[in-house]
């Protein structure tokens, strides 16, 4: 009995709770290991102790399995809680995410990005504005005013800076703006302003806010020199953009006089004439009167080659047009007038022309006399309706009188305007007046 008691006393852990391991504490938390041995059980045999130890070993194995299942359930819970975030991710990334939930890791990129200066640049469209788009007393506002005041206009012809004449009021405004600019420059302690005057072969740059002086910013901050664009590059970009977008009114007066041709005032005398064969046109069955090209295309749809009709032109400068079928589609051609002759191209002397419109239509009826680019008028499309009596009376009256003779008729003025509707203008004389004197 004494030996058994000594063995049991050796197995009892006499260390304090603070010095015990975590495994010992966990053993105390379970049922079988947490029960204290009473003095009555100390007298049990050694075989009973061995059975107890065997039972404890089986319990330890069961507890290890429970821990494994609990860990796997935790991983499943993490997968369900994170949703699609863990899909397609490696085990290492999952572990890093799980550790990051317990011990948040600082983002290095945000720490470095907060310390660096802003890389905001001034766009060319912002430099073209009349008012500063940036908040006052900001770095971008200072740069905007700096570029606007110290960049001279560019001559697009010589690609050099040209001096401009300023009035007294503009000079005063420029001096005031320059003083304000110097005061604003003193507010920035990290920059030094060094003026630099640039001269060219043709013109010297004058002093003032709108001259060819370039201001170079010398920065004392190494971070700003490395990360942000220098002011010299901004000025170069601005001057090149102004060279491309320079308006004509910025050029010098002498250059404008040399480049622009002299202007002359001309007086053109016209003679008004009525259509000579208006009655024959009205009696022609291919004449359809007032009609646009869309209605003509609808009438000519599906017709054979050479089918045509004569109609009034939709343009005020022309009287008549022909619509015809050629190359399996509907085409249109205006009848032009020049020197009392009618043709389809008045500017080409090789094109056939006729003193009346009916003769022009008769010429293009023959396919052998028609070129490939000229209208083919072989088959007329017959009109399906008669003209009004008023229109027929107008054609008969115009066939018996002239344009100036209509004014002598004893009829109302509205009737005279109606009779003069089908007429054309022909140039008689072109007189050049107010010609500038030739300079010796």
Swiss-Prot record:
Keywords attached to this Swiss-Prot or TrEMBL record, sorted alphabetically, are: Growth regulation, SH2 domain, Signal transduction inhibitor, Ubl conjugation pathway
Which InterPro entries does this UniProt record tie to the protein?
SH2 (IPR000980), SH2_dom_sf (IPR036860), SOCS4/SOCS5_dom (IPR022252), SOCS4_SH2 (IPR035864), SOCS4_SOCS (IPR037342), SOCS_box (IPR001496), SOCS_box-like_dom_sf (IPR036036)
* Bias kind Basic and acidic residues: ranges: 12-29
| Function as written in the Swiss-Prot or TrEMBL entry | SOCS family proteins form part of a classical negative feedback system that regulates cytokine signal transduction. Substrate-recognition component of a SCF-like ECS (Elongin BC-CUL2/5-SOCS-box protein) E3 ubiquitin-protein ligase complex which mediates the ubiquitination and subsequent proteasomal degradation of target proteins. Inhibits EGF signaling by mediating the degradation of the Tyr-phosphorylated EGF receptor/EGFR.
Question: Ranges for the SOCS box domain?
Answer: 376-425
Supply the name of the protein.
Suppressor of cytokine signaling 4
Enumerate the spans annotated as SH2 domain: 286-381
Source organism of the structure: Homo sapiens
- Pathway as given in its UniProt record: Protein modification; protein ubiquitination
Pfam families reported in the protein's UniProt record: SH2, SOCS, SOCS_box
């Amino acid at each position: 009995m004494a030996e058994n008691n000594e063995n049991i006393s050796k197995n009892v852990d006499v260390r304090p709770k603070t010095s015990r391991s975590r495994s010992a504490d966990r053993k105390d938390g379970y049922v079988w290991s947490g029960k204290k041995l009473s003095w009555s059980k100390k007298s049990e045999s050694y075989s009973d102790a061995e059975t107890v130890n065997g039972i404890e070993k089986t319990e330890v194995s069961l507890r290890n399995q429970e821990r494994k299942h609990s860990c796997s359930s935790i991983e499943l819970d993490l997968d369900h809680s994170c949703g699609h975030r863990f899909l397609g991710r490696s085990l290492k990334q999952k572990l890093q995410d799980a550790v990051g939930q317990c011990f948040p890791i600082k983002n290095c990129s945000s720490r470095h990005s907060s310390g660096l200066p802003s890389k905001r640049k001034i766009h060319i469209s912002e430099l073209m504005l009349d008012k500063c788009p940036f908040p006052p007393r900001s770095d971008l506002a200072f740069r905007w005013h700096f570029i606007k005041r110290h960049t001279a206009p560019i001559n697009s012809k010589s690609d050099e800076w040209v001096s401009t004449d300023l009035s007294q009021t503009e000079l005063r405004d420029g001096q005031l703006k320059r003083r304000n600019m110097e005061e604003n420059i003193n507010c920035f302690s990290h920059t030094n302003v060094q003026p630099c005057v640039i001269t060219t072969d043709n013109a010297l740059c004058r002093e003032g806010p709108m001259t060819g002086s370039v201001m170079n910013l010398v920065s004392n901050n190494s971070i700003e020199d490395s990360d942000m664009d220098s002011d010299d590059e901004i000025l170069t970009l601005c001057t090149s953009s102004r060279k491309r977008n320079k308006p004509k009114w910025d050029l010098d007066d002498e250059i404008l006089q040399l480049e622009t041709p002299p202007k002359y005032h001309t007086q053109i005398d016209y003679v008004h004439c009525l259509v000579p064969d208006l009655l024959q046109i009205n009696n022609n069955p291919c004449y359809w009167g007032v009609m646009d090209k869309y209605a003509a295309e609808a009438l000519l749809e599906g017709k054979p080659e050479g089918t045509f009709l004569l109609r009034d032109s939709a343009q005020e400068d022309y009287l008549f047009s022909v619509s015809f079928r050629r190359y399996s589609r509907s085409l249109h051609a205006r009848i032009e007038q020049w020197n009392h002759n009618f043709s389809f191209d008045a500017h080409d002397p090789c094109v056939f022309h006729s003193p009346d419109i009916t003769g022009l239509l008769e010429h293009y009826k023959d396919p052998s006399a028609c070129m490939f680019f000229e209208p083919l008028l072989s088959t007329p499309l017959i009109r399906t309706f008669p003209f009004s009596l008023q229109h027929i009376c107008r054609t008969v009256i115009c066939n018996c009188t002239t344009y100036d003779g209509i004014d002598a008729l004893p009829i109302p003025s509205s009737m005279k305007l109606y009779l003069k509707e089908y007429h054309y203008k022909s140039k008689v004389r072109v007189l050049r007046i107010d010609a500038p004197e030739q300079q010796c």
